[in-house]
Amino acid sequence: MKKLLTGALTLMLTASVSAQTKLWTLQECIDYAMQHNITLQRARLQLQSAKEDVSQSKAALLPSLNASTSHNLGYRPWQDSGITTVTNGTVNTKVDKTSYNGSYGLNASWTVWNGNRNRNQVKLNRLTEEQAELEIQETANSIQEKIAQLYVQILYLKEAVKVNEASLETSRKNEERGREMVEVGKMSKADLAQLSAQRSNDEYNIVSAQAQVENYKLQLKQLLEILGDEAFDVATPDAAMTTNEMALADVPALMSVYEQALATRPEIQSAEMAVKSSDVSIDIAKAGRMPTVSLQASASASTNSLANNDWSDQMKSNFNTGAGVSVSVPIFDQRQTKTNVNKARIQRESNLLALQDQQKQLYQTIENYWLDATTNQQKFRAAMATVESEQQSYDLLQEKFNVGLTNIVELMAGKDNLLVAKQNQLQSKYMTILNLQMLKFYSRPTPSSSL
């Protein structure tokens, strides 16, 4: 998904290279986050854990084999009889107070059938694995949306700083012109003080906007898991025409975006997967009513130091093998199976409601993006005309002010109106750009989880 958000924003990401601070493009921010974001890394670990569960459930279909052995020493201090042997007519009696015995065994078992519980467990774990993959995609999507929102907000505030700087430059010129007029007696010091106050207010607006830029940069750095002491800045567009054209792009149809999102968004697919998992869980619960058939086999041998024959002969003579089959038929389990089946069905209904809720939330999210894109685009069109009109009006006021044909109140009001118009234009432009990109983001296919 990391290329989707940058498709229409590509032209915004060209910037000159700074010798001191790396300028991060949107694509670079997304790529870095996909590798370093801790939440995403934890989601990948959950996928690895789910894969292990699948492997374990598959192995449960196979027989189990165990080897065992035990060795014991015994001591009988008052032993008075032992092993008697006759050698060359001589009777010898050996009394062993210490004895040793050992046993060796192999045991195998295999559950042949248990109502398909084991096979259904494999299915359930595979569905859980797929959900873990979708969780990675969902987490990645959420991170990319946040990155795009912060990135566009930084671009907006950077341009707002430039607008305020231009306003400050105008205020300084007006203040300088006011001083000249005071010197020749064409303006009172009270009017000059108003011009100075307007200049101070513009300086404050610049500081405030710059502080907001730094705040959003910090939020973006934290999202990317970049250390706080590292210099960080984002790439800015070279030309205003680029962002203007992007803000005036066609808004896609609401239902078209929603239908495509229903088919591709990982949160919807995950909710659908949860319903499928519920169906398998019901089958697993029903297996509690079925018999369990198992096969067993064993081989064992034992030795004792007090025996007359040697170890190898004992192993042969004491070697035993056996095999058998066992069948367990549930008759009454204190309603445990019925309870499990009912609870599994209740969980399925809950998952169906969760799916409906996800679909509703998805529609509401897309609807909000669509409405914001449509509304802000209309505002942007109107704001462009307003800025042009206010600029012409202010230029005329400034010309009149320079020759003493208008008062300070009208000049300041005209300047304030122009500043407000430019700020409204900026805000509506970048809000339109952001919401248009979100609509495109939601309407495009989701790639594989190998991010």
Describe the role of every protein-language-model region:
Residues 19-66, 70, 235-276, 447-448:
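Bacterial Sec-pathway N-terminal export signals of envelope proteins
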Residues 1-26, 447-451:
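Bacterial Sec-dependent N-terminal signal peptides
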Residues 66, 105-107, 151, 217, ...:
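Membrane-embedded beta-strand positions in outer-membrane beta-barrel channels/transporters
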Residues 41-45, 58-59, 98, 112-140, ...:
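Sec/SRP-type N-terminal targeting helices
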Residues 21, 68-110, 238-249, 283, ...:
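Small/polar, glycine/serine/threonine/aspartate-rich low-complexity segments that form flexible
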Residues 52, 142-260, 372, 376, ...:
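Periplasmic alpha-helical coiled-coil/stalk elements that build and connect Gram-negative outer-membrane
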Residues 182-186, 401-405, 442:
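A short glycine-centered flexible hinge/capping loop motif at secondary-structure junctions
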Residues 6, 75, 220, 228, ...:
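Acidic, low-complexity, intrinsically disordered peripheral segments
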